[in-house]
């Protein structure tokens, strides 16, 4: 498939799985890390990491089952190696539109690295583009002149029922893995080698944090510029590889201008801000129930767990805004394959929970 492509399988038809947009009052959105989605006989990262035919079919079946069960209208995918295979799979499930802006790196004709992100939609995609880095802002941030996103960000402009055009962004921010490793020297003492590796872990980890936080900053500035020019609603989804509110990425949901009491100006700012779908869902639930909600992790590593997968929304989806069209009526964290897996079914699923939300038209 060519880069920057929109793939409408049935341009003049309406998929049997899509409700008439005039009467559709709910929109379902999901973010889905596919975890090494690469069809055999190709290998991911190393020459011997290849799915058997049975493993690959199990993975394909798991993804199809999720789509059939939850029926999201728009899905942001991460860790995509086999672009054409994914496009074929989702089209069989009624997703007539598919967008991608990059392709993986291939070494020796079969070893794949640098997976990409993609978006599938049951609604028409009107435009697809890769988000470009603002080089002037890169310099102002003190970054290297050749700074780029570790993974290209997809922007797909989707035509939603009732609302119209919505710019949907799919991201997979830089991981927490240290940007470099310490060298082991056989002629150096054990203490010296341990110190070298520990220093690399600390400094390399911070380098990854700088990359991740800078990616978020440059993306948000691009989204604001686009919002100012086009006025489209905004939806940002993906694997952030970082808890949203711990500091590195917290600016993505900056709610207002500091040290400014001008209500008119603050109202203008809200047009450009993003909200965490979970926060909107929680706020809406407080209206109907006093029960305390607990946000489930989306990723487990050893004894620790964290929320790494997010969907962020603009004011059009915030029930607290009078001008909003939709509200977040449900938030689903599909994680049974992580906390209570059935090997025969979940053995080749994914190492992340799949996060989805329901957006309901406001009355």
Regions found by a protein language model. Give the residues of each.
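Metal-dependent phosphoester-hydrolase catalytic domains
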Residues: 2-18, 130, 146-149, 220-235, ...
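Active-site-proximal beta-strand elements of phosphoester/diester hydrolases
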Residues: 27-39, 165-174, 197, 201-205
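A long, amphipathic alpha-helix that forms part
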Residues: 202-230
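Active-site flanking residues adjacent to catalytic metal/cofactor-binding acidic residues
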Residues: 32, 78, 171, 238-239
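A structural motif
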Residues: 171-199
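Structured beta-strand-rich core segments of catalytic domains in phosphoester-bond hydrolases
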Residues: 76, 80-178
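N-terminal, active-site-proximal structural segment of metallo-dependent hydrolase catalytic domains
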Residues: 2-115, 192-195, 340-354, 358-363
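Short, solvent-exposed loop/turn elements at domain surfaces
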Residues: 37-42, 177-179, 320-321
């Amino acid at each position: 498939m060519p880069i920057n492509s929109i793939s409408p399988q049935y341009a003049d038809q309406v998929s049997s799985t899509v409700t008439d947009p005039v009467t559709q009052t709910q929109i379902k959105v999901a973010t889905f890390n596919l975890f090494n989605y690469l069809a055999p006989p190709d290998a991911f990262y190393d020459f011997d990491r290849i799915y058997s035919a049975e493993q690959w079919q199990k993975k394909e079946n798991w993804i199809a089952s999720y789509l059939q069960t939850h029926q999201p209208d728009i899905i942001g995918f991460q860790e995509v190696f086999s672009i054409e295979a994914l496009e074929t799979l989702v089209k069989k499930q009624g997703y007539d539109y598919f967008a991608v802006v990059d392709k993986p790196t291939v070494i020796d004709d079969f070893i794949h690295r640098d997976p990409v992100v993609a978006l599938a939609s049951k609604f028409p995609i009107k435009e697809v583009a890769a988000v470009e880095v603002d080089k002037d802002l890169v310099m102002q941030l003190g970054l290297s002149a050749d700074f780029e996103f570790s993974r290209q960000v997809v922007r797909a402009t989707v035509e939603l029922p009732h609302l119209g055009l919505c710019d949907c962004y799919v991201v997979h921010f830089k991981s927490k893995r240290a940007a470099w490793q310490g060298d082991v020297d056989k002629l150096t003492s054990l203490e010296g080698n341990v110190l070298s590796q520990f220093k690399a872990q600390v400094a390399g980890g911070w380098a990854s944090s700088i990359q991740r936080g800078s990616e978020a900053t440059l993306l948000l500035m691009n989204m604001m510029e686009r919002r100012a020019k086009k006025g489209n609603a905004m939806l940002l989804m993906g694997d952030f590889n970082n808890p949203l509110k711990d500091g590195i990425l917290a600016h993505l949901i900056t709610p207002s201008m500091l040290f400014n009491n001008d209500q008119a100006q603050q109202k203008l700012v809200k047009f450009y801000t993003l909200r965490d779908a979970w926060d909107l869902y929680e706020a809406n639930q407080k209206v109907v129930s006093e029960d305390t909600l607990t946000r489930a992790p989306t990723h487990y590593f050893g004894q620790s767990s964290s929320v790494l997968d997010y969907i962020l929304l603009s004011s059009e989806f915030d029930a607290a805004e009078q001008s909003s069209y939709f509200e977040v009526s449900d938030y689903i964290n599909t994680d049974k394959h992580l906390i209570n897996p059935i090997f025969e079914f979940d053995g080749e699923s994914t190492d992340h929970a799949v996060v989805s939300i329901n957006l309901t038209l406001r009355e």
